[in-house]
């Protein structure tokens, strides 16, 4: 099955494609569920399933054993409901004035980090005549969303009052790690301790949440003391390790699901001293063959991959030669026998010797999350 995303031209499968192995998603989620032990597993499918396609990957994740789905934005959660998913869905990032009523009507769980979110959820619940399912979020050390230690008691008290009124039900208490991908970092145990304190404060306020959740991919894999009632793996749903300090995917039974492939658009012989691409950041040192590859930064290939990242072409890894352009980049293939139409593998699981998303991340000084999630709308996803 090939999915044409908004902005992708029909019929360009031969040119470029992100092949998504849904069995790899199922296999990886099954491994995560096993790691979670008695805790339930929420598959995080935000950002269009980290670039892999939210709907097909959500379905595969549930087949692999997940029982919850998680999104950042309300429209993502509503799209899951529109696609027929009935499992619990948590959406956690909204601004004042967003359509909480639509979310409540669709049985989407909401997150509240501040009083305004509780008030808007309660107001929407009164309008719809339905009880809002809410997860209170504590900032235990990430310094991002979540109520601070000083504000947490008041948030719990407000939640308890609205629960007593019958307009909300506090389903969960949750937080998020700052350094879970560095399991020896002292903040990890510190955040677990502060999360336990936050749960105690919620209990003293009269709340009895059924799910307490803290663990992301890294904590799901290596910090069982952080599992509580529910774990929330994200990048590892798609077979990727959350960081080099955690270990390679295979160490945990994970398999990378995305392979980004295209085909050379042109090959040509050029003399020594030929400047290549914008600003001539690469110059040939001898007579050689150049290959033009029809993917660029508009497709999610970072411009910083200029003269840095490698691809597999003609049976060998080759470094990008010169500036990555909006729609294309160039390879210097020397005297090797290649032709227009030959396959170019940018990254994948590594089975054929191609670079992995981890290789690209290391070369570019970023994380594998960014490499896969930025693959653009012009690149069709083909599901296998």
Curated annotation (Swiss-Prot):
HAMAP family to which the protein is assigned, alphabetical: Ala_racemase
Protein name, UniProt field: Alanine racemase
Biochemical pathway: Amino-acid biosynthesis; D-alanine biosynthesis; D-alanine from L-alanine: step 1/1
Record family assignment: Belongs to the alanine racemase family.
Gene name of the record: alr
A GO-annotated cellular component: cytosol
CDD domains: PLPDE_III_AR
UniProt xrefs under SMART domains: Ala_racemase_C (SM01005)
UniProt-listed Pfam families: Ala_racemase_C, Ala_racemase_N
Active site: 46 (proton acceptor), 278 (proton acceptor)
Signal peptide coordinates: none
GO aspect biological process, one term: peptidoglycan biosynthetic process
Function: Catalyzes the interconversion of L-alanine and D-alanine. May also act on other amino acids.
GO MF term list: alanine racemase activity; pyridoxal phosphate binding
EC main group: isomerase
Binding site for substrate: 144, 326
Keyword NAD applies: no
Keyword Lipid biosynthesis: no
Keywords in alphabetical order: Isomerase, Pyridoxal phosphate
Catalytic activity: L-alanine = D-alanine
Cofactor(s) recorded in Swiss-Prot or TrEMBL: pyridoxal 5'-phosphate
EC number: 5.1.1.1
């Amino acid at each position: 099955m090939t999915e044409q995303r908004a902005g992708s031209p029909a019929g360009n499968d031969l040119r470029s494609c992100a092949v998504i192995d849904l069995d790899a998603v199922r296999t990886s989620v099954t491994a995560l569920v096993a790691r979670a032990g008695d805790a339930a597993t929420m598959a995080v499918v935000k950002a269009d399933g980290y670039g892999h396609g939210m709907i097909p990957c959500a379905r595969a994740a549930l087949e692999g054993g997940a029982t919850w789905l998680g999104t950042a934005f309300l429209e993502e959660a509503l799209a899951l409901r529109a696609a027929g998913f009935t499992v619990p869905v948590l959406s956690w990032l909204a601004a004042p004035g967003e359509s909480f009523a639509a979310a409540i009507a669709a049985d989407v769980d909401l997150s509240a980090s501040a009083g305004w979110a509780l008030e808007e959820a309660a107001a929407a619940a009164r309008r719809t005549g339905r009880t809002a399912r809410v997860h209170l979020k504590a900032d235990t050390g990430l310094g991002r969303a979540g109520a601070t230690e000083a504000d947490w008691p008041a948030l719990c008290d407000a939640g308890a009052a609205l629960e007593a009124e019958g307009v909300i039900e506090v389903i969960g208490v949750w937080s998020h790690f700052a350094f879970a991908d560095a399991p020896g970092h002292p903040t990890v145990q510190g955040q677990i301790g502060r999360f336990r304190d936050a749960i105690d404060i919620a209990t003293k306020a009269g709340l009895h949440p059924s799910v307490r959740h803290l663990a992301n991919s890294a904590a799901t894999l290596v910090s069982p003391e952080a599992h509580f009632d529910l774990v929330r793996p994200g990048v590892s749903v798609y077979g990727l390790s959350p960081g080099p300090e955690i270990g390679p995917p295979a160490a945990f039974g994970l398999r990378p699901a995305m392979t980004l492939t295209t085909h050379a658009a042109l090959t040509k012989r050029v003399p020594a001293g030929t400047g290549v691409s914008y600003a001539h950041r690469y110059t040939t040192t001898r007579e050689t063959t150049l290959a033009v590859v029809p993917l660029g930064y508009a497709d999610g290939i970072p411009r910083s991959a200029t003269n840095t990242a490698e691809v597999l072409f003609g049976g060998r890894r080759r470094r990008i030669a010169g500036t990555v352009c909006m729609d294309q980049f160039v390879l210097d293939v020397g005297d090797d026998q290649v032709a227009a139409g030959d396959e170019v593998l940018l990254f994948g699981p590594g089975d054929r010797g191609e670079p992995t998303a981890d290789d690209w991340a290391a070369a570019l000084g970023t994380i594998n999350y960014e490499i896969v999630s930025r693959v653009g709308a012009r690149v069709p996803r083909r599901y296998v």
